[in-house]
Each structure stands twice: as structure tokens, then as C-alpha cells.
């Protein structure tokens, strides 16, 4: 009888654990249509290097950007949608600048100011900052509540900037972020 109770207890705990794991899997991943964007670390001198992907998924709350990145510098980084579908370098003031062909922050409504992703008077391409852990990985999803459909972002690029983002143009323009460090074209 004791063996039977032990087996029953193990079976019940196994079923419960499987149910919890299954529920977690469904909660952790948005279920809508999605596209995967390949991301490269920008290095015009030595060639770009693959650092992973960002999956963009439609949800009831807006577009969810789920990074699966590695090999990046630890810390918070500016994370945006840029105007053009290019990650190529471009010359500015006689100097080759990484990712400059991507253009500026995507601003189809002409807001002309940097801000939070939920702010109606900010660039539509302003996303929450990307968190990179001490081991160089980024896996925390971010939500863009004003963006609803994948077709809105196709034909643009995802840009990761060195350094954080204060979601303002003050004291420094465009959130005070640094150079463009990684990019992916949204197809």
C-alpha cells in the first residue's frame, strides 16, 4: 500500500509539474504572427558579426520584441526602429559611420522628438531600452504598445545603440545613447 501511495504521489506531482511548465511556456511567448530578424554587431573595419535574432510578435497589447542575442556589452542600450532597411555604414563628415544607412529613428507621424514607447508625441520607432546581462546575452522581451501589426515595421531596421536611453532629447538628443553597435533589417 505504501508503494502505491508513493507512486500515486509521484504521478500527481509529475502531472502538476508538467502542467505548470506548459502554462509557463504559453505565458512566456506571445501567440500571434511573428517575424525573426537576424542581428549583427556592426564593425565596418573588420566586417559585421552575427549576434543572434530578435523575434517581433503581434500581441493584444502591441508588438513584442523578443531578443535572443549574445556577445554584446553588458548594460542598458538604446533600442529603436530606424527608417531604412539597411545596416550598411555610410560616410558622415568624411568618416565611415557604422549603420548610418539605416537613417534616423522611424518617425512616420513627424513627432520630431525622442520619448517613451507609449508617448503619442514621440518617434514611433522608440522602444524600451534593451537589457544585456553580464554574460553578454539579452533575452528580455520589450513591448511597443503603439505598434500593432508586423506590416508597420517591415522595410525598416532594428538598431541597438551603445549605452542607455533616457527617452528624452534632454540633456542629450535621442536619449543620450552612444554609437550604433548592432543592427538587423526587418523583412
Swiss-Prot record:
Domain of life, source organism: Bacteria
This protein's record includes keyword Metal-binding: yes
Signal sequence region: 1-23
Annotated catalysed reactions: 2 superoxide + 2 H(+) = H2O2 + O2
Gene Ontology cellular-component terms listed: periplasmic space
Chief location category: periplasm
Family: Belongs to the Cu-Zn superoxide dismutase family.
Protein function: Destroys radicals which are normally produced within the cells and which are toxic to biological systems.
Annotated protein name in UniProt: Superoxide dismutase [Cu-Zn]
Species this chain originates from: Haemophilus parainfluenzae
Top-level taxonomy: Bacteria, Pseudomonadati, Pseudomonadota, Gammaproteobacteria, Pasteurellales
